[in-house]
Amino acid sequence: MTEITAPKSAVTAEQFADEIREQLKYTQGVTVEQAKPADVYVAASAAVRRHLVDSWMKTQADMVNGNTKAVGYLSAEFLMGKQLENALLNAGLTDQFDKAVEALGFDAQEVIDAEYEPGLGNGGLGRLAACFIDSLASLGVPAFGYGIQYKYGIFKQEFDENGKQIETPDYWLANEEPWGHIDYNRDQKVSFGGEVVEENGKKVWKPAWSVRAVPVDYMVPGYASGRVNTLRLWTAKSYDEFDLLTFNKSEYLDAVKPQVEAENISKILYPEDSTPQGKALRLEQQYFFVSASIHDAIRVFYPGQDKPDLTTFPDKINFQLNDTHPVIGIPELMRVLMDEYGYDWDTAWTITNKTFNYTCHTLLPEALEVWPSKLIGELLPRHLEIIEKINDQFEAELKAKGVAEEIIKDMAIYTGDSVRMAYLATYGGSHVNGVAELHSQLLKDVTLKNFSDVYPDKFTNVTNGVTPRRFIKLANPRLSDLITEGLGTDKWLSDLELLKGLIPLADDDEFVKKFAAVKQANKVDFSNFAKRKYGFDIDPNTMINTMVKRLHEYKRQALKILSVIADYADIKSGKVSADDIMPRTIVFAAKAAPGYYLAKQTIQLINNVARVINNDPDVKGKLNVYFPWNYNIELAMNLIPATDLDEQISQAGKEASGTGNMKFALNGALTVGTLDGANVEIRERVGAENFFLFGMTEPEVSALYAKGYDTKGLSREYYEKDPQLKAAIDMVADGTFSDGDKDTYKDLVNDWLNKDYFMTLADFRAYMDIQAQIEETYRDPMKWSRMAVLNVANSGYFSSDRSIEDYLERIWHTGPLK
């Protein structure tokens, strides 16, 4: 008999239907007969919030009144996905919702689909933050997520008639948004500019302007924990929204100028920073949300106290810096402690150092933020002074430890011209963690080697994870039911290591066939979704081969599309008959940063390869490429369960971790990948025989760099000696995918042949060889499905619950509320 332990609310379906009906009447102002699915979505969301409020308030009260240290997760991104279905699951209301909505005459999925996905993140960083706050609540750990409520998100991606990416505003707040509760009574004042003066022997910052940070609270219900934490996102408002005198002079635009300037801070995620104004806006954003969050935490944990004892602040809350975006919080807390509460430098430093911890998410030098000191001085003059003093203290400490002058110079936080935020975070906090074992080792050996040599105890690893509630239970209900059937319990949703119980079932033909049937049904569902949403005609009887992630050269979408072009070239030249090709559908999805030229060129190329190949009768439908636009959580939740083969082909030593690889493995996709990021740990756990490995290792990559690969044009040698590679690049260069225009992709081709920094060409042959092995394996359906079962069974380690437990043990030293 199957044991079901999922949360189940005491409310009945009839009661829930009455609550929805009541919300429609009193909140929406419509009857059930007048209502549309969007109205029912808003009403149902309001009803769910009512069921969460008591637990939310109790969680906050227990957090403030108890002795359990809280976590403040500071992140520029929270890629939450749709809220209603997740809240229903975690609150135990899914069945009641389905029956109630049906009784009211609506389709439950249509109501779920009426929700517009929040535009609060870009990629893995934001999705990780969302998984983590879900796990914190599910484990009963008191926590705040702190960030910004971006009015227009990152951007909405569209493609023009030439396949180019077009960025348009993401109007995710244009319709009624029932989950965020704005609280004007708990606003914070955030100031910028001005000067620092000395008054009575003390430094006093006299800002030039201020904005109002208003919190918008989102409930974060835990799964089966009875706890509801808070995601607090700040929106920027002006203190002088409207100048009536100016307006009455018919100077209408000037009358609202202060409002526009203030609200720009929370307009979009990652504004283009190629201009001085864009750089300034990014820094304003970062300071805006960390300043508001620090002041908010003091208000929360020391309510009504004018002179709180902030020496206990690190015992109340630990701030986790999710990448470098919130690092300006270190000098901000120093400023608050010294200038607002009168603490001396040493006491303030001790408090600050104990309060902050830093997660580094990259190995790419350009992603380790460096701010011009001139800009910091203009926007945050007091903070620049504090940073200079931190650097002086740091250098003195290094000298006392006997560190060589040359190394001290290399480790400088403040160089005179710039401020290195990763270095400030490393010195200013208690711990630094990487996000996969290989990444953490490379941080210690390469990226932050000098810091690791001097402060070895600061460094640790916490491998990333994903929440199984959203990415298995919600995304893949068929697989979820099969897992529960196979294990005889649903406890795996809160203890994912229980998936190991599926290992013996990989030898059970009946179970493996059921598993394959689940995958095929998911492929049919995705085919229908893609037709409905994008107009694509995807054949669910082909292999679904997926590469979805942010578009960046190091992730090497170029390698994947070159392999597709090479296969196409073989068909066109007659070397291979389309009749002999294993049918394959390649799905790309990715956004490129608006100013990232080569990434946008790659998107254009993929779209045009798709246009040409998909319409060429010589291919006979055996090779198809699709690029659904505007990749988001909804698309991921439809595509991941349908995927047979997942591409994780970044250059070794460049990907910090990745979480897409975990989601795919947990949903029964096999992985082709390099020894990079969390691929290393996935392969170790699922077994080398169940992972398609190719490509150079990180030491081999380093050795090739040492030979001058990217500076001496060595990539051209690979092009010249590999006929398949040459044919593929020549097709791009000769205009095959640009209506005969040889200039369209000349910059991309030039980069491949003369630089190729991320060694796409160097790994091409190994990649083509592994693809041949993949095809051979896929032609044996039972073997493939057994391998897929073992991937699921051995991927339980990659739960975000386990990640949070590691943070609790290694970094935060706290636990669930009592």
Describe the residue ranges of each PLM region.
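A conserved ligand/cofactor-binding region detector
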Residues: 1-818
